[in-house]
Regions:
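Sec-dependent signal peptide recognition
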Residues: 4-12
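Extracytoplasmic/secreted proteins, especially bacterial periplasmic and envelope-associated proteins
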Residues: 45-55, 68, 72-79, 147-154, ...
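Acidic/histidine-rich catalytic neighborhood of metal-dependent amide-processing enzymes
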Residues: 137-237, 262, 266-267
Length: 277
């Protein structure tokens, strides 16, 4: 989680730019959609992937756990697709320390132009500055860092079993949570360094996706997903679609129709740097 924190009972499921349908409204009979067999999402597998990350310990950039977990994630994704790459770039964090950024990208059906983007951050916070005790110690990040990645690895497993009609890119952003605990003031934003870098240097030239979803802190007990401000601005159509499907499946208590303020997270930079309306 980043600059503007939500109350603890909220999670961050936010949406990236969604292309709009600019055709005039008219009564046209749409062809019936062909039924698609959807593989079952295994929640136990997703939780296992979270546990495997936590077992490496804190995973803030340049730490031992970060290096080991990054290697694990790359190896794991390569079992599901041969199109796995890394973005490595030297950076300097707010505290003056030098690091090498490590974004991890896995693509499915890379030649397909019709694509969606799924992303999460894989690093963890280097200080527990929102806890009441041991604030100078790093966190394990089971929820904040591990949960979104766990879900995406399980989705990668499913995508490897059945080719999708559309292409899918999974991006695990680094250094999302290595921001200044005291705030950035008027200086550059010290959070979300991985998404800022990717937004200025996408892994393919002229990158485009129909829409994207960022998963962050999605494993909280009694989680509530709301209509976050920036997501309403950039992807209202996808918000409605996802919430409608969630309610149809019986998950309405988690996907609530409540508008909440905009937050600064990785989706902010993906939207503003890549998918500007």
């Amino acid at each position: 989680m980043t600059i503007k924190q939500l109350p603890q009972y909220f999670v961050c499921l936010v949406f990236l730019w969604a292309c709009s349908d600019n055709n005039p409204t008219q009564s046209v009979k749409k062809p019936e959609k062909e039924a698609v067999e959807v593989p079952d999402f295994n929640a136990d597998s997703a939780y296992l992937y979270i546990q495997q990350q936590v077992d490496f310990g804190p995973r803030f950039i340049s730490s031992k756990g970060w290096q080991q977990c990054g290697d694990f994630l790359v190896k794991k994704l390569k079992t599901y697709t041969r199109y796995v790459e890394e973005q490595n770039h030297p950076i300097k964090t707010y505290d003056g320390k030098s690091h090498t950024l490590r974004n991890i990208i896995a693509s499915f059906s890379p030649k397909k132009n019709n694509r969606i983007l799924l992303c999460a951050h894989w690093d963890t916070r280097h200080v527990a500055d929102h806890d009441v005790e041991r604030q100078n110690e790093p966190i394990l990040g089971a929820n904040d860092g591990g949960s979104g990645v766990g879900v995406l690895i399980e989705l990668a497993r499913l995508l490897s079993k059945q080719e999708s009609r559309i292409g899918v890119d999974i991006i695990l952003f680094d250094a999302e949570d290595y921001g200044n605990p005291n705030g950035d003031g008027k200086g550059p934003i010290s959070w979300c360094i991985g998404s800022q870098y990717w937004g200025n240097n996408p892994h393919t030239t002229d990158y485009y996706a129909q829409y994207g979803i960022l998963l962050d802190m999605v494993a909280a007990k009694d989680a509530r997903f709301t209509h976050e401000g920036l997501s309403r601005t950039y992807a209202q159509r996808i918000l409605k679609k996802v919430w409608s499907e969630a309610h149809r499946l019986g998950y309405g208590s988690y996907f609530v129709y409540q508008s909440t303020p905009q937050i600064i997270d990785d989706h902010y930079f993906v939207n503003t740097l890549i998918f500007q309306p």
